[in-house]
């Protein structure tokens, strides 16, 4: 195998805007700032909400309503 062809891995810190600090190994040589992480993302925190704009979901269900007979 050839030597000195692989990138160097170094330990960096990824800092989220919520204050969470994550230490990871990466090929980049500087620390990074994140806008969102698993600690503050709505999907992971359970604060996710579904927004139905103007009853569009209901209109879709009504428009494409199939009976069991039509599916067979």
Curated annotation (Swiss-Prot):
Annotated InterPro entries: Ribosomal_bL28/bL31-like_sf (IPR034704), Ribosomal_bL31 (IPR002150), Ribosomal_bL31_A (IPR027491), Ribosomal_bL31_sf (IPR042105)
Residues that, per the record, bind Zn(2+): 16, 18, 37, 40
GO BP field: translation
An MF annotation (GO) of this entry: structural constituent of ribosome
Keyword annotations: Metal-binding, Ribonucleoprotein, Ribosomal protein, RNA-binding, rRNA-binding, Zinc
UniProt cofactor note: Binds 1 zinc ion per subunit.
Listed cofactors: Zn(2+)
Pfam families per record: Ribosomal_L31 (PF01197)
Cellular component, GO annotation: ribonucleoprotein complex; ribosome
PROSITE patterns documented for this protein: RIBOSOMAL_L31
Keyword rRNA-binding on entry: yes
UniProt subunit comment: Part of the 50S ribosomal subunit.
Functional description taken from the UniProt entry: Binds the 23S rRNA.
Family: Belongs to the bacterial ribosomal protein bL31 family. Type A subfamily.
Protein name, as recorded: Large ribosomal subunit protein bL31
Gene: rpmE
